Amino acid sequence: MIRKEQLYEQILEQIDLTKETDDEELQELIRTVLDEAADEEYISLSDKIRIGRELFNSFRKLDVLQELLEDDSITEIMVNGIDHIFYEKEGRIFRSKKCFLSQERLLDVIQQIVGESNRYVNEASPIVDARLKDGSRVNVVLNPVALNGPILTIRKFPSEAITMEQLIRIGSVTDEAANFLKKLVAAKYNIFVSGGTGAGKTTFLNALSNYIPKGERLITIEDNAELQIQGVQNLVRLEARGPNAEGEGAVTIRDLIKSALRMRPDRIVVGEVRGEETVDMISSAMLNGHSGSMSTGHANNPTDMLHRLETMMLMGIDLPLQAIQRQVASALDIIIHLGRLRDKTRKVLQIVEVEGYEDGRIQTKVLYEFKEEGMKNGKIQGCLMKKNEITNKEKLLAAGYHTV
């Protein structure tokens, strides 16, 4: 039986390392090696095509991961060492039959991905976040932290940003709620999108950002560039950078927020806040005349999101908790909470208004809430129901919206 690793080694031996081999030359070399192998042992045409494609991917692309990346129905790829490759499809986890030829080949693919993002990873610095050219999010963990071999996780993003109309069509949000949010964005309400891992926060923030008036100057700030803002001409995209091998040259989210404030922004969108940069997002951006700012955060519910914001602000500034709570209550207008339900669908579960600070705590009001109504054909039935009218209408009225 023809072994792919033997063919790989034969091709590697015949490549002229003194000059660059283009794609056409490589494909011709692969065909020649396959034809020679077919003279010794029968290879069907379909197998020839498959093996040829796999060999080309090994040299030019991301090896055995390439086919998974090209499958639009796959949303996540998980590599646990060379021969344990899993992927998520339609909410379910499957194991791939593919495997890397060696740990060295897997490490080559990892270094290729990380290098294209201007990051680095090695045993001295074994954890890194990066991204693919299409914006897909990548996380890498190496030995000695990863005990069973290199760990590579890729969360894929659609080639084109999902719109709010598409989210309405698949039932993630209702038309009524989306129209309400459209008015809030246009009226420059400060909005946080919360939810657990994989709830669709970045996707929803992308869709929400399409409601930003196209004539505004928008600055996006991210750890890894994932946002796909559409239609805004005056757009500035900033991406944080980790330290170099000498531990120098890091540019943090906090640094970028401070810099963005000097760029005359109409709005600032931060992909996700995780730590002390929350101080600058809340105190400097949202409370400093840049209404309409948006961000996301990990939380189990809107109340949890508020507590996490308080905790993250305490990490970055020495103020009493009461003062922190007052700042959060003054800065934040709306929390949109997303969830991934047991049928694997993603939905808006709550839209909550932050009313202010009173009686020693931040006061909130549920405006919309998802109400489950049972199961049908394995899918959860329900609707995002309006519960209350918004209290703080000043920004809506100033924007010309007299009915909501």
Task: Describe each model-derived feature in a short phrase.
Residues 198:
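Walker A (P-loop) phosphate-binding loop of P-loop NTPases
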Residues 343-404:
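NTP-binding/hydrolysis catalytic cores, primarily Walker-type P-loop NTPases
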Residues 201:
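Conserved lysine of the Walker
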Residues 195:
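The Walker A (P-loop) glycine that initiates the GxxxxGKT/S ATP-binding motif of P-loop NTPases
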Residues 188-191, 207-330, 337-339:
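Switch/coupling sub-region of P-loop NTPases
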Residues 1-123:
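N-terminal accessory targeting/assembly segments
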Residues 11, 77, 140, 181, ...:
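Residue-level signature of catalytic and energy-coupling elements of molecular machines
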Residues 71, 84-187:
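P-loop NTP-binding catalytic core
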